[in-house]
């Protein structure tokens, strides 16, 4: 099985850019404190990097 990464949304999306909101939805995150487990690929890492001020990598 491929490596996975867990991402948690730690800040709300109000006042953020529309593209950043779309990126958070693309990561599978809905509300604050929601956690999503994703495949550890360069594309996912880039999305996490783009919204790093909103999310936290759990593992």
Curated annotation (Swiss-Prot):
Claim: DNA repair is one of the keywords in the record: no
Gene Ontology cellular component annotations, sorted alphabetically: cytosolic large ribosomal subunit
Entries under CDD domains matching the protein: Ribosomal_L30
Listed Pfam families: Ribosomal_L30
Stretches assigned to coiled coil: none
GO biological process annotation, one example: translation
Keywords, in A-Z order: Ribonucleoprotein, Ribosomal protein
Entries under InterPro entries matching the protein: Ribo_uL30_ferredoxin-like_sf, Ribosomal_uL30_bac-type, Ribosomal_uL30_ferredoxin-like
Alphabetized GO MF terms: structural constituent of ribosome
Record's subunit section: Part of the 50S ribosomal subunit.
UniProt similarity note: Belongs to the universal ribosomal protein uL30 family.
Name of the protein in its database record: Large ribosomal subunit protein uL30
Organism annotation: Herminiimonas arsenicoxydans
Lineage: Bacteria, Pseudomonadati, Pseudomonadota, Betaproteobacteria, Burkholderiales
């Amino acid at each position: 099985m491929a490596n996975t990464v867990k991402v948690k949304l730690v800040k709300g999306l109000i006042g953020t850019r529309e593209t950043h909101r779309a990126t958070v939805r693309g990561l599978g995150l809905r509300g604050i404190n929601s956690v999503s487990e994703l495949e550890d690929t360069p594309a996912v890492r880039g999305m996490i990097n783009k919204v790093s001020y909103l999310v936290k990598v759990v593992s």
